[in-house]
Amino acid sequence: MALISLAIDYKKSPIEVRSEFALSGLDVSMLYKSILAIDNVVHAVILSTCNRTEVYLEITDLRVVDDILAWWQSYVRNPEFKIRDYFKLRQGTEVIMHLMKLACGLESMVLGEPQILGQVKDSYTLSKKNHAIGKELDRVFQKVFATAKKVRSETRIGHCPVSVAFSAITLAKKQLDNISTKNVLIIGAGQTGELLFRHVTALNPKHIMLANRTIEKAEKITSTFNNASAYYLSDLPKLIKKADIIIAAVNVTEYIVKCEDVGEKSRVFIDISIPQALDPKLGDLEQNAYYCVDDINTVIEGNKDKRKHESSRAQKIIVKSLEDYLEKEKAIISNSAIKELFQKADGLVDLSLEKSLAKIRNGKDPEEVLKRFAYEIKKKVLHYPVVGMKEASKQGRSDCLVCMKRMFGLNVEK
């Protein structure tokens, strides 16, 4: 089997493209069921965040990439967006290296940001829950998690707080004076929404409104702060009227706040959702300030240098970790092949041996029976190597012939 990944991320695709190809907000079990139904797709892990959507796969034929792209394209709402214009294909070792760097935060818009590791772990867990991960892919992810833990403990790559959530709040502070007199509406109580809430509470605003599909989760988060309340998403119309700052971090398939919902009050809109939850046209209204994930990059750049010198140390750890993984995989593959070879030999010998013993018990000459037994075993054991050598010779594969000669202790010079 071959290991591949297909990805769309912020490096090549702007937010409007990433929004179209995002797989978040969809029925996860349905996604896994549909991708595993594709011929030659054996296992899969689907990762979808605000900055990237990536699919990690074990396949039996590289030609299946066309079918996977067609599968992905089927979830795009706007047919003008063609996945072939944006996706990146990685194969083999490149997949593992990328995933290690990704989990360590080296591939993030926010260098070293810690959230991505949790998102990768969540994706892995969902894959296991949907019986979509196999032994090899499981070993890859376990090594990735161990590597990320080592990088976090042995470097300071994540010590400067420049997460997307932190940067979003920094941006809001720049846009509004005296935030202690402002009402803040946060839409979404997931991992990012909770992080946003923590950063906002540190600014001590007048009031925080946290809206979520399930109010229980929002209530649990808001219970830690006096001036905060939990609401359902269905309460948005009345919450928008009260809010001075609206920040969205929620999985939706269409805009949940549009121009006609906001009136003439001046507001700051920050949307870190993928797909986008706040209509970008809100920024066209003179009284509003509107920012999306890509805009936040300007805030991030200021702090990036503080982490860059740590990234080289992280890279060295990753390279060593990858080398260790590949060495262990070679041993696993070798041991598996050796085990299979012995099982094959046992099967050949056991069948012929039983027949030979039966002949001896029936009075056949033991010497003749043993000679016949040895002849049959020789033919059976050498059958596949001989066929392979003939095929290699026909194809002009002298390298295969040399390899086979070495396997059987033959003279490679002849």
Swiss-Prot record:
* Top-rank lineage group of the source organism: Bacteria
Task: Pinpoint the site Important for activity.
Answer: H98
Residues binding substrate: T49, C50, N51, R52, S108, E113, P114, Q115, Q119
- Annotated residues for binding of NADP(+): G188, A189, G190, Q191, T192, G193
Listed pathway(s): Porphyrin-containing compound metabolism; protoporphyrin-IX biosynthesis; 5-aminolevulinate from L-glutamyl-tRNA(Glu): step 1/2
GO terms (BP aspect): protoporphyrinogen IX biosynthetic process from glutamate
The EC number(s) attached to this protein equal: 1.2.1.70
Listed under catalytic activity are:
(S)-4-amino-5-oxopentanoate + tRNA(Glu) + NADP(+) = L-glutamyl-tRNA(Glu) + NADPH + H(+)
Active-site residues annotated for this sequence = C50 (nucleophile)
What's its top-level EC category?
oxidoreductase
Q: Name one GO molecular function term.
A: NADP binding
What are the UniProt keywords, alphabetically? Answer: NADP, Oxidoreductase, Porphyrin biosynthesis
Record text about domains: Possesses an unusual extended V-shaped dimeric structure with each monomer consisting of three distinct domains arranged along a curved 'spinal' alpha-helix. The N-terminal catalytic domain specifically recognizes the glutamate moiety of the substrate. The second domain is the NADPH-binding domain, and the third C-terminal domain is responsible for dimerization.
Q: Beyond the main fields, what else does the record say?
A: During catalysis, the active site Cys acts as a nucleophile attacking the alpha-carbonyl group of tRNA-bound glutamate with the formation of a thioester intermediate between enzyme and glutamate, and the concomitant release of tRNA(Glu). The thioester intermediate is finally reduced by direct hydride transfer from NADPH, to form the product GSA.
Job description of the protein:
Catalyzes the NADPH-dependent reduction of glutamyl-tRNA(Glu) to glutamate 1-semialdehyde (GSA).
Identify the PANTHER family for this entry. Answer: GLUTAMYL-TRNA REDUCTASE (PTHR43013:SF1)
**Quaternary form?**
Homodimer.
Q: Which family does it belong to?
A: Belongs to the glutamyl-tRNA reductase family.
Under what name is this protein listed? Glutamyl-tRNA reductase
